């Protein structure tokens, strides 16, 4: 597919009537268009508007948004095991979010969305936090809840909860261990990713990557796959 994006310049407003804890008000509109290379038909269109978007003096953000979507599925789509047959779908969603300064030692954010989703409805909530007590350590945790109602060919209901943990430990800027763990509490499916990155000389790296993930097989039984990857890159500068 081809992709076209349009970002209308966000208007940054500084006004004396804004409360002192608000740095600026930045409303804007963002659009995306995707077309099929085979047929030239529109595959996906998104228009996202953030009329109420406030940047705070402490580096945080409070915002609300509305998103209108058009999805033209050319093949069946199966999010979280829910089958959606090909067709044209139009729906609108709304949401709000708030966060403190992402660069702060302690970071917290919240996001809540509701509205249409293909031929049904989806309510989404995410809470996340991160702590970076020293530059060498970064730890994060998040919780997501997805409630599907009337989505898919069977028009059923399903709730999917995800718990995620991520970490970064750096002995120095050249040697880092990065980890990610996700648990799907609804289907008891887990995934783990560990990556060791070592820059043994400028712009030359050694990567060691371990992946383990659970998935539901075609026979609806829980299955597991493990992979281990190594990568060596070398750059000689003249």
Regions found by a protein language model. Give the residues of each.
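Exposed, low-structure sequence patches enriched in small/polar residues
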Residues: 14-238
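Short, small-residue-biased leader/transition segments that mark boundaries at the very start
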Residues: 2, 6-13
């Amino acid at each position: 597919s081809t992709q076209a994006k349009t970002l209308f310049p966000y208007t940054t407003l500084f006004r004396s009537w804004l409360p002192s804890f608000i740095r600026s008000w930045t409303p804007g509109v963002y659009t995306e268009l995707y077309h099929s290379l085979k047929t030239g038909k529109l595959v996906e269109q998104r228009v996202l508007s953030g009329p109420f978007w406030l940047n705070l003096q402490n580096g945080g953000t409070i915002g609300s948004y509305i998103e209108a979507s058009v999805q033209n599925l050319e093949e069946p789509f199966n999010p979280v095991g829910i089958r959606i047959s090909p067709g044209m779908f139009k729906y609108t969603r709304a949401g709000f979010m708030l966060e403190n300064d992402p660069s702060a030692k302690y970071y917290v954010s919240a996001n809540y969305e509701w509205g249409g989703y293909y031929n049904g409805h989806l309510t989404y909530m995410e809470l996340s936090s991160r702590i970076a007590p020293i530059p060498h350590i970064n730890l994060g945790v998040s919780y997501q809840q997805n409630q599907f109602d009337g989505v898919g060919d069977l028009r059923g209901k399903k709730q999917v909860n995800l718990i995620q943990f991520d970490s970064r430990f750096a002995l120095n800027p050249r040697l880092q261990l990065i980890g990610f763990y996700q648990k799907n509490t609804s289907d008891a499916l887990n995934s783990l990713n560990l990556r060791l990155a070592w820059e043994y000389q400028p712009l030359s790296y050694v990567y060691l990557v371990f992946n383990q993930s659970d998935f539901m097989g075609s026979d609806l039984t829980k299955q597991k796959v493990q992979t281990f990857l190594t990568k060596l890159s070398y750059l000689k500068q003249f």
